[in-house]
Design a protein with these regions (language model features):
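A sensor for short, sequence-defined functional sites
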Residues: 1-429
Length: 429
């Protein structure tokens, strides 16, 4: 049995002795949607006013209310259960989730297709074996909309899937989407094609980080760090916290802190509900670091307590005769970081100059200021394009250098005790 048929329990194989109309009708009507699934689909979509709302209602249910059995794709030999059995059990493999989603969608007048990822060979003459693929996503919805979805993760926002590295994915198509108006269209129960995956989320990506910190007269640091995010990083953290026991959340936050250049001990963690996917995901933690500042040093210099903004590396020098390639900047992303740092009373602060660099493909700005014993700093980078031509390598290298130079700037602190000391008098001549 072909894989598209295997993923459609109750599917029929077209009978070539019948007319095209009869064959297509059989493919459209089989398998029939079980009564319990029909009722569930009606319950889920009754208040929906369009295909987008119907698709999202079904997705939210299959994603969050049907528990995922975390098995590798094909671990059961693609032996799947009927939709009504999956619905009644409340649990499903990633293949089972497609079965249930497909049946609910059909009941609501929608269409979805399985997408196999993790392998790509568009030049092969033979159909690839199912065992070479690693994961199953879902694409579909109404006739004019195509959403990419992954209900197996349980916490992925609607339309957001794990980034796909391959240039193409394997899409399975059943022929109930072949139109009789095309007399050359083969009536077959299992078509397939290689399809380009989405290049990024269906909504703008952003990440906001705020740091509220204080340094004591002993040099100890305490800080509250909060992330608010949408996009690929959001999905990564939702999955990480969702799959980690609450008593281990400090470990996850500790890794996040290290990745952003913060050292110390995470003392508490607070996150938004990973399953509340309609809103951006938030992560907050408190971190302490003893002897962050050594006041005995003259002068005292510290970095701005902001996550380092990562940039794609400039391209290496192009070899003679090598075909020109584009410079990949990734999905357009807006990253905004802000810091407020309280210092001991009387501390004198010298802040560096801010930076502003603007290109058509990206913008970067930074600001630093001090008032009394409080330092504020902010940095923001906004990538506007996914890629730029290779011949702009020098310009991009200059942009990267400006950002890196800004992030390397230090804040100078003069303790109150030193400021109060009278200047040494010059020896008498």
């Amino acid at each position: 049995m072909r894989l598209a048929d295997a993923l459609t329990p109750g599917a029929v194989t077209p009978d070539p002795s019948k007319s095209r109309e009869e064959q297509l009708h059989e493919l459209e009507t089989a398998p029939r949607v079980p009564e319990v699934v029909l009722r569930k689909a009606k319950q889920l979509t009754d208040s929906a006013t369009n295909d987008a709302e119907k698709t999202r209602a079904i997705y939210d249910f299959v994603s969050a209310k049907i528990e995922t059995v975390d098995l590798p794709l094909g671990a059961t030999g693609f032996s799947v259960r009927p939709a009504d059995e999956i619905l009644g059990s409340g649990y499903a493999t990633q293949e089972d989730k497609f079965i249930l989603f497909n049946s609910l969608a059909k009941a609501a007048g929608l269409g979805v297709f399985p997408i196999l990822t993790g392998f790509c060979d568009v030049t092969a003459s033979a159909v690839p074996r199912p065992s070479v693929f690693k994961h199953l996503d879902i694409v579909g919805g109404g006739p004019h909309y195509r959403w990419w979805m992954d209900p197996s993760l349980e916490v992925a926002p609607f339309g957001l899937i794990t980034p796909i590295k391959e240039k193409f994915v394997f899409m399975l198509l059943r022929a109930n989407h072949v139109y009789l108006a095309n007399p050359n269209a083969l009536i077959d129960s299992s078509f397939w094609l290689w399809k380009e995956p989405p290049k990024g989320p269906p909504f703008p990506e952003f990440q906001k980080v705020s740091v509220n910190a204080a340094v004591t007269s002993e040099g100890d640091l305490s800080a509250k760090v909060k992330y608010t995010m949408r996009g690929d990083n959001e999905l990564l953290l939702r999955v990480a916290f969702h799959q980690t026991a609450k008593e281990k959340w400090k470990d996850v936050a500790g890794l996040l802190a290290l990745s952003d250049g913060f050292r110390g001990q995470v003392t508490s963690v607070d996150i938004s509900d990973p399953m509340a996917t309609k809103d951006p995901f938030t992560v907050g933690y408190e971190i302490t670091q003893a002897k962050f500042v050594d006041w005995s040093k003259k002068p005292v210099r510290i970095p701005a307590l902001l996550p380092q903004i990562g940039l794609p590396d400039p391209p290496a020098r192009q070899a003679a005769g090598e075909a020109a390639r584009t410079i990949e900047l990734g999905t357009p992303l807006d990253v905004e970081t802000q810091m407020t740092l309280k210092l001991p009373a009387g501390t004198v602060v010298q802040t560096p100059a801010g930076t502003s660099v603007e290109r058509d493909y990206a913008r970067f700005t930074s600001k630093y200021s001090a008032a009394a014993n409080t330092v504020t700093a902010s940095r923001r980078v906004n990538f506007l394009m996914r890629e730029i031509p290779r011949d702009r390598a020098m310009d991009y290298t200059s942009f990267v250098h400006a950002v890196q130079s800004d992030q390397a700037q230090m804040i100078t602190l003069v303790p109150a005790a030193d400021e109060a000391k009278p200047a040494k008098s010059s020896p008498k001549q």
